[in-house]
Amino acid sequence: MRKWALSCALLLVLLLTTLPDPAKKLQVNAEESSDEVGDFPKVEEKLGAVPHGLSTDSEVVQRESESISRKTLRNSAEKFEFQAEVSRLMDIIINSLYSNKDIFLRELISNASDALDKIRFLALTDKEVMGEGDTAKLEIQIKLDKENKILSIRDRGVGMTKEDLIKNLGTIAKSGTSAFVEKMQTGGDLNLIGQFGVGFYSVYLVADYVEVVSKHNDDKQYVWESKADGSFAISEDTWNEPLGRGTEIKLHLRDEAKEYLEEGKLKDLVKKYSEFINFPIYLWATKEVDVEVPADEEESNEEEESTTETTEEEETEDDEEKKPKTKTVKETTTEWELLNDMKAVWLRSPKEVTEEEYAKFYHSLAKDFGDDKPMSWSHFSAEGDVEFKALLFVPPKAPHDLYESYYNANKSNLKLYVRRVFISDEFDDLLPKYLSFLMGIVDSDTLPLNVSREMLQQHSSLKTIKKKLIRKALDMIRKLAEEDPDEYSNKEKTDDEKSAMEEKKGQYAKFWNEFGKSVKLGIIEDATNRNRLAKLLRFESSKSDGKLVSLDEYISRMKSGQKDIFYLTGSSKEQLEKSPFLEQLTKKNYEVIYFTDPVDEYLMQYLMDYEDKKFQNVSKEGLKLGKDSKLKDLKESFKELTDWWKKALDTEGIDSVKISNRLHNTPCVVVTSKYGWSSNMEKIMQAQTLSDASKQAYMRGKRVLEINPRHPIIKELRDKVAQDSDSEGLKQTARLVYQTALMESGFNLPDPKDFASSIYRSVQKSLDLSPDAAVEEEEEVEEPEVEEKESAKQEAEEPEHEQYDKDEL
């Protein structure tokens, strides 16, 4: 009986091997028609088919065999030309990022996550948009077709209409392209491609043909396809499996990109770049499992032949006791494997999260996948009337347009979640503009879910959240300074603490170089936190030796009896170091703060005092350096000169001439009134395109000429005035000295020609030249008319290309 069964089994196997293989036939047909447009099956023909997300590799190949091997745009599709900016951008991406092809997967997953965020938000007010069954599952699926070299990434997000496909994939905001190109030309980190909104086009690093299948609830299912050759096509999709809703991107990989068909490679990339995406990412992965199968018939027969003969009774007993013979074999199966099973970082306890996990999460959040870690972070929970969890980061670098669009940008770097549901990143009221460089997440359990963004923005809880976020943000920045050994002494630290702090050496200086302007803007805009922000200020000074110092450090070095904090504004440290306003201050060992940023002029209009110390601009009136016992006598001695000089400069707008207490080597300087503009501020305002000239004249304030009574020039002028106060030459000399002082004090000369003429007259006098010495006239020589004609003839005979070269030059 068993031998008969064995014979039947062998015959069946033989018959099966002679049958044709349908899969191979399909493959041959696909290869033969690779350059032709076939008839694609209609959607109606596929009703009842297994959902695409759950089908096996062989079913996918069979279902799509007519389209997957073709890499030409369908003849029936509506064709478009790429916008010029897009074509230029794709060339840049392909040529510049070729060595970092991995980023394409990161960008596609990031886009899929954004689409899922959008549909989840829409579902808050309309649950029907989510759909039912598999369509309602908010997840990202990655699938491989090694045979046809296709990598597919699918999401069940909001999807795209036909118009969306044209707008989002065929055109691009010029500003995004320009910013990306500028970043590339300045040697910036091109890993930041996602920040410019051009990440999708990185697919052409690995694919030479791309299909984007998308279904939006408000439109039919469409296919967008392109070979990156300057054009793309869009057609209604009647051959792919209905998506229900969402987008599937099919990348037909280049030969040199086969590594992205390896499951291990994709798993590594997801772990590296997308581990903290807020939606599950699944890979259709192969897996080996142990399976119990019946033992082969041949093995059973061999065992029978080797056994000794038994009696009929023994045989019956053995049959009753004998169990089916099985063996364990390895079997390959495919199933969906979850690649990102990490819990949202901000929901975990700060003690459970490692530095590496914080850094990875920051890179995912900021779409910045460079090597730089965030400078600092603050992870905290708030309890009470308003409960929320938050995670804030200080980026390693300032965004490329942080201050260019400071007052116009509406988008925030903070993502607002309500009960783990992403709501928006456009709530600019969560943080003030001066802290807009911070990145992070706020997740509230108090805010309502089922209201519009506009209503949510007016919710009273937001004010409480904002207040706590500001306080935590400023504490985070303060701690960044405290942990920097360049900022504070290590004397009271243990060896382990010193070692840890060495790693953060120079961190606050780096922060200040990137975001110092934001701290200054905060002092201008936020009166409530002005003192907290003032503690974060850093600057160079006359005693800092190139290092940055704080106001607290300055105060700790103030001289006994010094009541004011001295500062000077200008365009550069080098210019300020040579300023005549520092002469007496330096001689008497006073420290002076250098402010060289244009925003510093505005800053000091709001920062009037710090720790009960007033700020004093040393280029303005009111400088006090202690009592001078001889000052009264000097004023009396030079009274005739100061009165005469004031009259001599009557047309120059000088309010008064006074004895100075701030000069040592310089004969005189021009200072402004306490509330008037400094010379530096005048230049800043004059550079404004739409500045008001009448306002400038008013805000300029009074100017005072301060003279150095100990300088030989001033003493000689006093004597000359006493001898002949009506001398025109003396008046010209006095005006020249004033104009020189005006220029040395940082002001622009109102009449440079008059100043130059005065200089030339002085030079003439020093060379013993007569004031009436005339300039020698040049003899006029008439050029022969023949030469002009020759010249014209020569020009006419010049070749056209030479003339073109001249014009170009």
UniProtKB/Swiss-Prot annotation:
Pfam families: HATPase_c_3, HSP90. ATP binds at N111, D155, N168, F200. GO terms for cellular component: endoplasmic reticulum lumen. Keywords: ATP-binding, Calcium, Chaperone, Endoplasmic reticulum, Glycoprotein, Nucleotide-binding, Signal. Coiled coil: none annotated. Residues 1-18 form the signal peptide. Transmembrane segments: none annotated. Belongs to the heat shock protein 90 family. This is Endoplasmin homolog. It comes from Hordeum vulgare. The lineage of its organism: Eukaryota, Viridiplantae, Streptophyta, Embryophyta, Tracheophyta.
